[in-house]
Amino acid sequence: MPREHDSKYHRERDMRSGLQETASRAHLYKGEYWRQIFNRRTPEQRRTLSHIKRFMERLAGDIKFRTAVSESVDAPRAVTERYGIEVDPLEILPLWRDDHLTYRYKPESAPWPLSIMWDEYMRDMLRHRDLLRDHGDMSMTNPRFHAWRERQIRRCNDELGGSAPSITHPIIAFELSEGCTVGCWFCGLSAAPFKGYYEYSKQHAELWRGVVGVASEVFGPAARTGFCYWATEPMDNPQYDRFLFDYYQITGALPQTTTAAPLKDEALTRRVLGLFNLYGTTMNRFSVLSTAHLNQIHRAFSPEELTGVELIMQGKDAPTAKAFTGRARKRKEKLSARQEAIAFPERNHTTIACVSGFLVNMPQRRLQLVTPVPGSGRWPLGYRIVGQRSFRTPDEFRDGLKSMIDQHMLESPAPDLPIRFRRDLEYTAGDRCFHLRSRSMEHRVLDYAPISVGHLIACGNFTASELVMRASTDGISVLAVADLLDQLYAAGVIEEDLDDRYAWQTSDGITDR
C-alpha cells in the first residue's frame, strides 16, 4: 500500500561502507506473514478494521462525505451510519480531524484506541510490502539475475524519488490480453485499445502452464512474485481466474490482482476474491476512477468483503499521486502547450512500472527484459526495455530467458563499452574522493588512484578496459581501480542504458519521436 514520502531527501554515505551493508531481515515467507496479520487479530477486530478502512476510503474518494463529516462536529456518527459504516468518527479523531492529526503516532493518541489499532495494522501492511521485495531473492537459484536485480533496486532507490519505496521489483509479469477496454486518462503505461484476450483453450493452457513451469524452474521461489497484468485490464479476460489458479498450482503463490473494472464481470471478480480468500498472500487492488465508481463498488461489496482489497482513488480530484509517464505525461504536455493547467498531484512520482525482470506477452508470445526508470522522452512509459525475444514453446521461452540473462546481466562493466555515470547524476571532484548527487541521495566515493577514476568516468570517453589502464600505474593499482569500478557498477551509478533499439517506444511499439 502506498506510503507518504518527502518529495526530496538527501543523505551522504561512503560508497565502500554502503556496499558492504547486507540485509539481515529474516526471510519469512510472505504467505505466513500475511496470515499472521489477520490471525493475531480477533474476528471483531478484523470487522472493525474493515469499517475503519471504508471510512478512510470515503474520506479520500468522496468530497461530499468528507465535508459532511467535517461539518458534523458533535455527531459525525449520523453521517457514517447513512453510508453503512459501523464506526464512530469520534473514536478515530487522530486519523482524520485536522486539530487531532498532531496526536497520531504519539502517546497522546491513547484516548483513541481504534486509531492506534488502525495504524498498527497499516504498519503491518507496509512491513509486508517490504518483505515482498525480499522474496525476489535469487542469490542461490540464479546469482547473475539476482545481482542484476539488486543493482536495479539500488539505482531505483537513487533515481526514482518518491516512487522508489513502494516498488517491490517483482521478477516477472504476464499479459493475458492485448490492450485495455478501460482507457484511463492517467494510465502510466499508455495501454493500447483492446484487441482481444488470450483464451484458455487446450493449446493455450498447455503453453501457459509450460511457460510458468519454466519460470518456476529457472527462478525458483522468486517466481512467486509474478503477476498477470501490465498494460492490460485483468477483467478483460473472462478466464483470468483459471490462469491465476494454474499459477498457484505451479509456483505455490496466487498472483496479486489490480483492476480498474471490478464491476465489469462481478462474478469473475468474486471468483478472483474467492481464490484470494483461499490462497492469497498479497493484497489485491481496485483502481477507483470517480466518486460514482466508488459508490458502485461500495454498493456491490461489503466492508468485510474488501478487507483484502486496497482501493486506490484515481479520480481527478483524488489525492493519489500520478506518475509523469504514459497517457498522463502526454495529457500534461498537451495542456502545457496550450498554457492550460492540469490539476493532479505528482509528489515526485516518476513511474508506475515495478518489474525488474521479465515482461511476458502471451498473445504475442513476446519476452522482454525490463526495469523501472523515471518517465522521460526516451522512456515515456517509465520503464526501460533492455532486451527482447520471441517464443513459441516452453523450451524457446527458456532459451530466451537464458540468452538475455547471459547477454545483459553482466557481473562487471562490459570491457569494450563506454563507461560513464548515469545521466541524472551530478559529479563533483573532491580531495582523494568525488561526490555523486542524484534527486534522492549524495554518494561520497573514496578515490586514491594515481589518476582520478571519477574524473575519467565523468569524461565518458573511455571503455572500462581503457580506463583501468589509464588510471593505473602498477599491478596493484590495476586491481584497485578494477575493484572500484565493480563497486560503482554494483551500486547502480554506472550508466547501463547504452542501447537505443527500444527507446522512445509507446506501449504499441510505435516510436514516439
Curated annotation (Swiss-Prot):
Superkingdom classification of source: Bacteria
InterPro entries: rSAM_PoyD
Keyword annotations from UniProtKB, A to Z: Plasmid
Region (Disordered): 1-21
Segments of skewed composition (Basic and acidic residues): 1-16
NCBIfam families xrefs: rSAM_PoyD
Protein name as it appears in the record: Uncharacterized protein y4wI
Species the sequence originates in: Sinorhizobium fredii (strain NBRC 101917 / NGR234)
